[in-house]
Structure formats: structure tokens, C-alpha cells
């Protein structure tokens, strides 16, 4: 070899070795969890992100930043849609106080109106007077008689309210709104969008059972969500015998087996039929709806509990982007499960 070339080649090799040996290994994603109580229920969030040092170097939020961001989302929604916060926008609207509506209220209202129209009124946020009358809100009292429930029906109906110039207009001042069947789904979506906007695309958000799974885990596995098996008692331990795999999809479960009151030996379920003014009666114990967003899944889970299984299945034929797992009682009183065909490949049984 030409000695004049050997020395430069050796130096280049030495420099390359030095660069490789001194370069820092790429920071790896780590698993983080957030848990707490909010909106009268729990939240559980799992996400994959860099540790604080690596996140700061990459100009990404730290764990404290993420917690503060999520807390601010909960706070903004509570100040807008809470029935238990007397100073919320919703409380003021229900009290007929002239109030300028913010975008959170308008977005939820518009979504609710869209699903009311889509379900022919089976989903309806104007059922608040009936929910209060049956004692499912923060007020207690004897259950309404058939005549009393009928008298409240005149104030129920999504076509009796509208937004104009950022203010709510009611046909009757007695009409009140309840966003509980859609607000938690909306909250779940907001948190997921917040995480994704900060490059945290592998995460799962659960707000009171309204779940959204974003992307896959770093190892390539899909997120797995358990579906609760209905029980005969409110206080019975939760049991799960079914898992569903999700990716960029939401699942929301609605059921009456834990949400009811008993008066004079009569069980009143919390799902109110907006058309009759009475609790829904059918064989359906619970329904778990999958949808592109938690807002959609939340609204439809409630609507399906009003419809019953047969009508819900007919709805899904027309709208295949929505699928469901139904748990119901057959004619012999046995608990059965029926799964939409499109979901069967995603279902696992827990032994």
C-alpha cells in the first residue's frame, strides 16, 4: 500500500471509531400511567413517552407538563358541562340565566343534536327533567307516577332547543339539558388529541369506562380492553370474561345492571326512554359500542340501551362504522352474548 495513503485512512478509521463510541444511545420510550378521580368517576391513562430529560432535549412536554395539560382539560369541561357545579355554563343554562356559550358547550350540543337526529330521538340530552324526577341526578324524591312522567314529556325533545348567536334558545323554560351521556366520551377524545398533538401517539385513555386506544404499543401489540360481565348486584365484584383488541378506535359500555334505584320493591333503571318518559324495558343488560371516536361510542351506547338489541342491530346495518357486543337475557333468563360479525376477529375470551 502507498504509505502516503495509509496514514490518512488510519486517521479516518480512528475518527469514525471515536464518533461511534462517543455517540449517545437513542432514548427509548417508557411506559407511564396517570390515575385519578374526576367528573364523579375515575380516569386511567397509559402512554409511552420519553423520560423528562430526553423529552426536554426533544422539546417535548415533561410528565408534569402532561399532567397539567390533562388537568386543564378536565377543569374546562367541568366548568362547562357539570350538573353538580352551580357555576357551570350548563347549570346557568338550565336555570334560564342568559349565558354566552363557549366552544366546548357548542361542540357537545352539536354532536348531541346530530346523534339525536341519527337515532330518531333515542339519544336526547333534554331528558334532564325526567332523570331528576327518577332520582338519578343529584336530587332525591319519590318516583313520578305515570301521569307525572307524562306531564314532563312536553318539555322533552331535542327539536325544542337550539343555539343562536352563541346562546341557547328553549321552546319551554322547563326544558333542561344533561350531557352525561356524551361529555365523558368527549373528554376522552380531547385528552387523546392533546397527547397526539405532543407526539404521544401510543396511548389509551379511559374516563369512567369511555375508552380510546391510539396506535399500538411500542412492541407492535394492539391495546386490549376488558368488557365487564353484568352482575345481579350493584355491590358485586366486577368480573371480566371478554377482551377486545383496539387500534385507533374507541369502545364505550353502557348498562343498567349497576345503575338503578329501587323503590317499593320496583327497580328503576337509569336509561330513560325519551319517547315514553319511562325507564327503558327490554332484555338488554349492557352494550359495548366501538366507534372511530369516544364521543360517537358514548352517545350510541346510550341510544342502543334505549333501542334494545334488535333495533340497534338494524341501525348498525345502515351504519357499519359502528359495531357492538351485546349482553342480554334470553327467554329462559340466561345471560347470553352477541357480537357483531366485524368484531369477532378482535375478541378474546378470558379463561
Which sequence ranges carry the predicted segments?
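Mature catalytic core of soluble alpha/beta enzymes
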Residues: 2-10, 16-351
Amino acid at each position: 500500500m502507498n504509505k502516503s495513503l495509509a496514514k490518512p485512512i488510519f486517521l479516518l478509521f480512528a475518527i469514525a471509531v471515536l464518533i461511534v463510541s462517543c455517540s449517545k444511545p437513542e432514548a427509548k420510550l417508557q411506559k407511564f400511567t396517570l390515575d385519578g378521580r374526576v367528573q364523579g368517576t375515575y380516569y386511567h391513562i397509559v402512554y409511552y413517552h420519553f423520560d423528562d430529560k430526553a423529552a426536554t432535549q426533544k422539546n417535548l412536554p415533561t410528565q408534569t407538563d402532561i399532567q397539567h395539560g390533562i388537568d386543564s382539560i378536565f377543569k374546562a369541561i367541568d366548568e362547562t358541562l357539570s350538573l353538580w357545579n352551580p357555576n357551570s355554563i350548563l347549570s346557568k343554562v338550565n336555570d334560564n340565566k342568559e349565558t354566552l356559550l363557549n366552544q366546548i358547550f357548542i361542540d357537545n350540543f352539536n354532536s348531541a343534536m346530530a346523534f339525536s337526529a341519527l337515532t330518531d330521538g333515542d339519544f336526547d340530552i333534554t331528558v334532564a327533567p325526567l332523570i331528576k324526577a327518577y332520582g338519578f341526578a343529584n336530587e332525591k324524591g319519590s318516583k313520578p307516577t305515570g301521569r307525572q312522567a307524562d306531564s314532563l314529556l312536553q318539555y322533552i325533545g331535542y327539536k325544542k332547543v337550539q343555539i343562536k348567536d352563541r346562546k341557547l334558545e328553549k321552546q319551554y323554560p322547563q326544558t333542561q339539558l344533561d350531557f352525561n351521556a356524551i361529555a365523558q366520551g368527549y373528554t376522552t377524545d380531547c385528552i387523546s388529541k392533546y397527547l397526539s398533538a405532543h407526539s404521544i401517539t401510543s396511548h389509551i385513555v379511559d374516563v369512567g369506562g369511555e375508552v380510546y386506544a391510539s396506535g399500538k404499543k411500542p412492541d407492535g401489540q394492539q391495546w386490549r380492553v376488558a368488557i365487564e360481565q353484568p352482575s345481579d348486584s350493584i355491590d358485586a365484584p366486577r368480573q371480566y370474561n371478554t377482551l377486545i383488541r383496539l387500534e385507533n378506535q374507541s369502545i364505550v359500555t353502557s348498562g343498567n345492571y349497576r345503575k338503578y334505584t329501587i323503590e317499593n320493591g320496583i327497580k328503576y333503571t337509569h336509561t330513560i326512554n325519551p319517547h315514553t318518559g319511562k325507564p327503558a324495558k327490554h332484555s338488554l343488560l349492557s352494550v359495548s359500542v366501538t366507534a372511530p371516536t369516544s364521543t360517537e361510542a358514548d352517545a350510541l351506547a346510550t341510544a342502543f340501551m334505549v333501542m334494545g338489541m334488535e333495533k340497534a342491530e338494524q341501525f348498525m346495518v345502515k351504519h357499519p362504522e359502528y359495531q357492538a357486543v351485546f349482553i342480554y337475557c334470553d327467554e329462559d333468563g340466561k345471560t347470553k352474548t352477541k357480537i357483531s360479525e366485524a368484531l369477532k376477529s378482535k375478541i378474546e375470551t378470558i379463561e
